[in-house]
């Protein structure tokens, strides 16, 4: 096992906040594997690179010799996490949650070592709690403290409803740490309230409180908003190798090092070496190719990574995107048909040409042929190809933000 200092440096890499660092140092000094917990509510079947920030950190803990607990919130998934939400989320059925959970497991084991990963379901202990147990759990926190959360506070002050079951979510997540006797819990920055709840409940139940490590929310391909499927600025880990490759090669230069730090398994020493190469005149696109190949290999295998540049779809005669791929912003007030976007982006002479290209299969979005039914989402960024020679990395921005 690495020294405490070496472990701490890797643990803190890319992290937003570590609470409490001195406590974690003491835990590490004992020289025993720590129980590292991260919970995931399977509320959608497909993961994107934003989800993998936490999973990558779990892998780093795993490589340091610690016990990883990949907690699937099949019980909490039926409540719905209210974090950052302005309205009550519709609950999922147990069948939906379990179906999604199986899909999650097949995806996360492309990152985690399944032989060294403990998979847990929080229904295992939550289903056994009696009404009296739930009342005891609920008595550990007050409504006033719950309303300190920004999302609850905003909804309360704007007279929007907050269902009682939503107050239970952070309590249940906190109780998961009690049930698992977690030493460390990971979560996104939007989960800090829930993670701290785990510390408080562990104290209340006579356990040593866990340390918490918050990880940043990964920016999407637009470099501004968090990665989200609904915003169209995501890279899905099950996307075809060529599509994944083309999206990653076309990220803004300003986003490149952020992605390396949070998504790459290269050491910081190696990443700093790549930065030095870039400062010495290396083409940033060549550096992004290294990142793209690493991630394609992780999720699709080495052979797929070696061929990804030729299967990217957005290719010229040598199977490559142009080095000078233009960055194009198109202002809009709402989602827009692809024909209008191509016209406004200047990738076609007029709307009629756009319609003709769409009808003949001459338009590709992120490597995939699309037809006139494709809708460009407001805030989304895509690599667009119209015909054989017109390329652009197009972002549909709000007219308000473009003023």
Curated annotation (Swiss-Prot):
'KMSKS' region, short sequence motif: residues: 226-230
PROSITE patterns listed in its UniProt record: AA_TRNA_LIGASE_I (PS00178), S4 (PS50889)
Ranges for domain S4 RNA-binding: 336-396
Catalytic activity: tRNA(Tyr) + L-tyrosine + ATP = L-tyrosyl-tRNA(Tyr) + AMP + diphosphate + H(+)
Group of enzyme by EC: ligase
Enzyme Commission number(s): 6.1.1.1
Binding, ATP: 229
Role, per record: Catalyzes the attachment of tyrosine to tRNA(Tyr) in a two-step reaction: tyrosine is first activated by ATP to form Tyr-AMP and then transferred to the acceptor end of tRNA(Tyr).
Protein's name according to its UniProt entry: Tyrosine--tRNA ligase
């Amino acid at each position: 096992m690495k020294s405490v200092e070496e472990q701490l440096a890797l643990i803190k890499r890319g992290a937003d906040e570590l609470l409490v660092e001195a406590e974690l140092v003491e835990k590490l000094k004992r020289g025993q594997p720590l129980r590292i917990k991260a919970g995931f509510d399977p509320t959608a079947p497909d993961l994107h690179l934003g989800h993998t920030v936490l999973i990558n950190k779990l892998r780093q803990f795993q490589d340091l010799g610690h016990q990883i607990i990949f907690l699937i919130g099949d019980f909490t998934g039926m409540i719905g996490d209210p974090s950052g939400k302005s309205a009550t989320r519709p609950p999922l059925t147990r069948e939906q949650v379990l179906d999604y959970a199986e899909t999650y497991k097949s995806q996360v084991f492309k990152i985690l070592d399944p032989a060294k990963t403990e998979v847990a379901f929080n229904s295992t202990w939550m289903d056994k709690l009696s009404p009296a147990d739930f009342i005891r759990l609920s008595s550990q926190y007050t409504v006033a403290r719950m309303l300190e959360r920004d999302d609850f506070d905003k909804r309360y002050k704007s007279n929007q409803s907050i269902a009682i079951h939503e107050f239970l979510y952070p309590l249940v997540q906190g109780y998961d740490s009690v049930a698992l006797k977690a030493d460390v819990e990971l979560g996104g920055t939007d989960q800090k309230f829930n993670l701290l709840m785990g510390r408080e409940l562990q104290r209340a139940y006579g356990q040593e409180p866990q340390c918490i490590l918050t990880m940043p929310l990964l920016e999407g391909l637009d470099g501004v908003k968090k990665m989200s499927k609904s915003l169209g600025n995501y890279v899905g880990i099950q996307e075809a190798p060529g599509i994944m490759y083309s999206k990653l090669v076309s990220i803004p230069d300003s986003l490149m090092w952020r992605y390396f730090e949070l998504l790459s398994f290269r050491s910081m020493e190696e990443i700093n070496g790549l930065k030095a190469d870039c400062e010495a005149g290396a083409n940033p696109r060549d550096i992004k190719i290294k990142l793209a190949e690493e991630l394609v290999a992780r999720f699709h295998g080495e052979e797929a990574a070696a061929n990804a540049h030729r299967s990217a779809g957005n290719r010229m005669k040598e199977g490559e995107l142009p080095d000078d791929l233009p960055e194009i912003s198109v202002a809009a007030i709402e989602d827009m048909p692809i024909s209008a976007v191509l016209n406004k982006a200047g990738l076609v002479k007029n709307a009629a040409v756009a319609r003709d290209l769409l009808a003949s299969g001459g338009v590709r979005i992120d490597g995939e042929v699309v037809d006139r039914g494709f809708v460009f989402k407001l805030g989304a960024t895509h690599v667009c190809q119209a015909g054989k020679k017109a390329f652009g990395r197009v972002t549909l921005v709000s007219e308000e933000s473009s003023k």
